[in-house]
Design a protein with these regions (language model features):
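Canonical helix-turn-helix DNA-binding module
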Residues: 55-108
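N-terminal leader segment of winged-helix/HTH proteins
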Residues: 1-38
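Base-recognition residues in the alpha-helical recognition helix of bacterial helix-turn-helix
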Residues: 19, 46-50, 75-77
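Short glycine/proline-centered loop/turn elements that form peptide/ligand docking sites
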Residues: 37-41, 73-76, 80, 130
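N-terminal positioning helix adjacent to the helix-turn-helix/winged-helix DNA-binding module
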Residues: 13, 36, 43-44, 106, ...
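Terminal interaction helix/tail motif
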Residues: 113-154
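N-terminal helix-turn-helix DNA-binding core of bacterial DNA-binding proteins
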Residues: 30-70
């Protein structure tokens, strides 16, 4: 009798998969951060990037939740961005206790400059990674991210 193979990955395979994703993230973030202009850190760029792709304004709490960091860590990042003139932090018009954060035109310009500064890194990756492989992997990674994102919110 032949044993039926499971289509489910083993725990060891999943551990190795997520370990590889983690190492890739560390490597790319280190390279990416070296290319960022004007002393911008990856966490600061990530907040500016969030504003460019998700919403024009948010509370510090919403940002902390989106980035899965403590409110204190997000406040620290926002203070640094504000001191550089990249975000504006104002009182919320509906609540005296809450604040709203938005990207400034200077922040938008630096975000574009940062994206452009990473172009050589992206171009190098494009030369060394076949498009078909990237597209297949991207689809799978998006499914994993969506699954993990749903679990985070439940």
């Amino acid at each position: 009798m032949t044993e039926k193979k499971s289509s489910q990955p083993s725990e060891a395979t999943l551990f190795t998969y997520f370990n590889e994703v983690s190492i890739i993230a560390q490597l790319i973030i280190a390279q990416f951060e070296r290319s960022l202009p004007d002393g911008l850190t990856n966490s600061q760029f990530s907040v500016l990037n969030w504003f460019s792709r998700v919403d024009s304004q948010a509370s510090p709490g919403r940002l902390a939740t989106a980035f899965q960091v403590t409110p204190g860590a997000m406040t620290n990042t926002l203070k640094k961005l504000k001191s550089k003139g990249l975000v504006k932090i104002e009182p919320d018009e509906f609540s005296d206790r809450k604040k709203k954060v938005s990207i400034t035109s200077r922040g938008e310009k630096l975000h574009k400059k940062a994206v452009n500064a990473t172009a050589p890194l992206i171009q190098e990756m494009a030369k060394n990674c076949p498009l078909e492989n990237i597209q297949t992997q991207l689809a799978q990674l998006q499914k994993v991210r969506e699954y993990l994102d749903q679990r985070r919110q439940s």
